[in-house]
UniProtKB/Swiss-Prot annotation:
The keyword Acetylation does not apply. NCBIfam families: mtrH. This is Putative methyltransferase mtx subunit H. Belongs to the MtrH family. InterPro entries: Dihydropteroate_synth-like_sf, MeTrfase_MtrH/MtxH, MtrH.
Amino acid sequence: MFKFQKEQEIVNIAGVKIGGQPGELPTVLAGTIFYDKHEIVKDVARGLFDRDAAEKLINLQESSAEETGNPYIIHIFGTTPESITRYIDFVAEISEAPFLIDSPEGTVRSHAAEYVSEIGLADKAIYNSINMSINASEIEALALSDIDSSIILGFNAMDSSLQGRMEMLENGAGLLEEGLLSIADRCGIVNKLIDPSITPMGNGAGVALKMTITAKAKWGHPTGSGIHNAPSAWNWLNKKKEKDPVLYKICDVGSTCLQQAAAGDFILYGPIEYAPYIFPMAAMSDIMISEAVADLGIEPASRHPLNLLV
């Protein structure tokens, strides 16, 4: 293992600390709720859902976090302003944890940014994400909001190489007038969480691991990803899924360890139902990484899995 020469930033979002040197802080884990085709959602457009089932899932993630010491974030996914508003209200009612506001639609993300600012929850909200498709109206909405935490996505549709992704953050890679980090500054983002973006296996999925290390070495910001998207989009594995769903789950959950070994600080692990599997897996990796850097002068946090489970 290794220690970065660059000072590593630790951000604090609603009490959850993210970042630092490998082995210093436990990996922060974010499970997604209300995702596409989530069985608890009854009306996608209006955001109607089974409240009891949703509460149980949120509590499931919380209890997993309490046991292993890995902090958690609730990843809210919505497709309309009405739905994401309902989801935010519910999550804030049930949990004190920070939450990601995520949507494939920029207008929905913009609405969510405005809404959390209006109701006084901007300090708990993490915008997902500032990326190459962001337009002037979305930038304006985010800048006018009170949100100061955001994921910054290193996806480059024209060049998925390490250089292409790094340049997207640094200078716009010739596709934007400025880099995404500069846009984040203009939007008032203080807590920058870099996501190298997970592309399909065979199309640069592994580059994200290299970029995690490279980005932390260059900028020192907390870095992580939704690495499970690589195995979940793997055609070969999906053909095996119907016959052996356990095999699929092993690969999906196991990908967590790869991102951690590449110095990842946070992981968007997908369906929140996977919490009972993800948290022990992440805790195991955190313990081994912390032991591996012990001779480099890196002390684990008091509630690190190394201090709770060994």
